[in-house]
Swiss-Prot record:
Single Gene Ontology MF annotation: tRNA-intron endonuclease activity
InterPro entries registered for this protein in UniProt: tRNA_endonuc-like_dom_sf, tRNA_intron_Endo_cat-like_sf, tRNA_intron_Endonuc_cat-like, tRNA_splic_SEN34
Biased composition range(s): Basic residues: 122-131
The protein, known as: Probable tRNA-splicing endonuclease subunit tsp-4
Pfam families: tRNA_int_endo
Stretches with biased composition (Polar residues): 170-184
Chain's role: Constitutes one of the two catalytic subunit of the tRNA-splicing endonuclease complex, a complex responsible for identification and cleavage of the splice sites in pre-tRNA. It cleaves pre-tRNA at the 5'- and 3'-splice sites to release the intron. The products are an intron and two tRNA half-molecules bearing 2',3'-cyclic phosphate and 5'-OH termini. There are no conserved sequences at the splice sites, but the intron is invariably located at the same site in the gene, placing the splice sites an invariant distance from the constant structural features of the tRNA body.
Keyword Phosphoprotein: no
EC number(s) stated in the UniProt entry for this protein: 4.6.1.16
BP term (GO), one: tRNA-type intron splice site recognition and cleavage
Region (Disordered) residue spans: 117-138, 169-188
Length: 315
């Protein structure tokens, strides 16, 4: 892990009770270093009904946010309040700095575009159809001319030279010559035209804060942390009938192995729930995992967490 990632603080924006990450670098960091996938929720304004490929922002579980806070690699910001406060108190220097950062991003986008265009042109250069070779000109051998034909050719040449001279005189008289041919014509100054961009974050305008609003403590947090610490990746499990879908590695590489539910230590679990969850897990080729943590007492803190897997063997 690089030193920049060691000092990295992920900004989690709390908006309307949801925990969102807008920076793509933060998204890559928490996925690569902390095994957190979460869910992309962004969509395109031109096509809001599409639900196949979603983009930024990334919405975190409350368990994700709490776990990152406990590891001291993130902070939670009250986004609406911070933006309103910063916009009201922004001075000229901060505003110029923000505009300069936007211009830098536009220049970077232009460089990336130019590089991609050059690579595309070089790639397709060899695929273009080669030009057909020009037919060679055959110079006829000199033939002896008769006196009459020689006189005719000489007259035609003299007439062409006279016409050319007359044309040169007419052109020179109608158009004045340039006094200084070595001086190139000056081109008008063109203002640098950069591509327009839409910033995905406002980090350049808002400084890194340390505000950490309270994160509601869910009962599923112990099981969630237990699985994450053992290298499992967790995604929503509604489509498989559980609270979580549990993967042995990155979901880009593996199928889910478990559908998981969290229960309280003393919570009564109906037998029908065990049967239906076990049968459902087996039907979708997964094991049903359930777990709970022993609560804290006066003599000890929150203790061990126990997890069990159930498979329906009669199908």
């Amino acid at each position: 892990m690089s030193s920049t990632e060691d000092d990295r603080q992920v900004r989690i924006s709390k908006i309307a009770g949801r925990y969102l990450v807008f920076d793509i670098d933060d998204v890559a960091y928490i996925r690569r270093q902390h095994g957190i996938c979460a869910v992309f929720t962004g969509t395109m304004p031109q096509n809001p009904t599409q639900n196949v490929f979603l983009g930024l922002p990334l919405e975190l579980y409350a368990e994700d946010a709490k776990m990152l806070l406990d590891r001291k690699v993130a902070y939670i910001a009250d986004d609406p309040l911070e933006h309103l406060t910063q916009l009201k108190s922004m001075d000229d220097e901060t505003r110029k700095s923000y505009l300069q950062s936007i211009k830098t991003q536009r220049r970077t986008a232009q460089l990336v575009f130019n590089e991609a265009k050059a690579q595309s042109m070089a790639k397709h250069k060899d695929k273009r159809k080669p030009k057909q070779p020009q037919p060679s000109v055959v110079v006829p051998t000199e033939l002896p001319l008769s006196a009459s034909s020689a006189d005719g050719v000489a007259a035609a040449v003299d007439q062409e030279e006279e016409g050319g001279a007359e044309f040169l005189l007419e052109s020179s008289s109608s158009k004045p010559l340039k006094t200084d041919a070595s001086t190139p014509p000056q081109k008008p100054l063109v203002k640098e035209k950069l591509p327009a961009i839409t910033p995905t974050t406002s980090n350049a305008m808002i400084s890194n804060g340390t505000s950490n609003p309270d994160v509601e403590n869910h009962t599923a947090l112990p099981l969630y942390s237990y699985l994450n610490e053992r290298g499992y990746f967790i995604t929503p499990g509604l489509r498989f009938g559980g609270d979580f879908s549990v993967y042995p590695g990155d979901p880009f590489r593996y199928h889910a192995h478990y559908m998981a539910n969290s229960y309280g230590w003393d919570e009564k679990i109906p037998m029908l729930d065990l049967v239906t969850s076990g049968r459902l897990g087996t039907a979708v080729k997964k094991s049903f995992l359930m777990g709970g943590q022993k609560p804290a007492t006066e003599d000890s803190e929150a203790g061990e967490l126990r997890a069990f897997c159930i498979e329906w063997a009669g199908m």
